[in-house]
């Protein structure tokens, strides 16, 4: 019972953090959460508390700590990249910083591209996908690269998802020939 109350208390404290919260307080709360997780590794709220560390860093807009965070699954990887991208997109105050922000955003989109290329299906990532696509990230060559990877893994569902992704976009850069080749890959599986 007491552990449930402590977990709820930690979760409530995370919700009060914002960009003006002193770093010492943010770090102390993060340490408390990590200690609780370590001491109560089988607690039913463990996943929620692990997520609350991520939420804490986003609320505090602590990009350095976010960069050090190692997500343990694809969904969290996408969430971390999205948070980093949102923070970089909102930090456009000075000209010198804009160049740095652009480099950081490009690096984030490059990480996203690697996830897109190497995974059949990604969790909801509309903001990153849109930014990546609008900057010319998804080329015909990359579509073929992903299709070959999926074909090599005998991933018929992944090829189907990729083909549907092509159908969804109006005025897509890809031509009908790419879609036809994807269809052939699917037929071979």
Task: Identify the residue ranges that each predicted region occupies.
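Alpha-helical solenoid repeat scaffolds
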Residues: 1-189
